[in-house]
């Protein structure tokens, strides 16, 4: 699937964004954080393809292990809408469940071996 523009938001609507991304191939990650949050992620895209429309101040950033990746969460509802990747910090991924008109349960997903990237602690 080719990249297209989507509108998206967190659960409470405090964070709204637009993103140009493909939906497939969708990916799950097996690192310690992703196993717990259970999100289905888009393919990687350039940072310039993500535009925060509303609520940038409501975002909180979480980092762990090498502290290269930046995982963003809404400080009101706790939903993870997107993150800056560790493998390539110039690239991002979006939580496909946050995109308007996308059913993440209708998509097949591959599993990324994020657990193998841990160099500091178990992942």
Model-derived segments and their meaning:
Residues 1-9, 14-123:
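A short Gly-Trp-Pro
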């Amino acid at each position: 699937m080719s990249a297209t523009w989507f509108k998206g938001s967190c659960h409470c609507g405090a964070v709204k964004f637009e993103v140009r991304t493909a939906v497939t191939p969708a990916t799950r990650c097996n690192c310690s954080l992703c196993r717990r949050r259970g999100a289905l992620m888009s393919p990687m895209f350039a940072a310039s393809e993500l535009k925060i429309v509303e609520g940038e101040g409501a975002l909180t950033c979480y980092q762990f292990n090498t502290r290269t990746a930046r995982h963003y969460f809404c400080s009101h509802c706790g939903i993870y809408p997107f993150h800056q990747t560790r493998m390539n910090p110039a690239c991002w991924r979006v939580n496909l469940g946050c995109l308007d008109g996308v059913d993440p349960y209708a998509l097949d997903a591959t599993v990324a071996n994020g657990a193998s990237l841990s160099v500091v602690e178990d992942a």
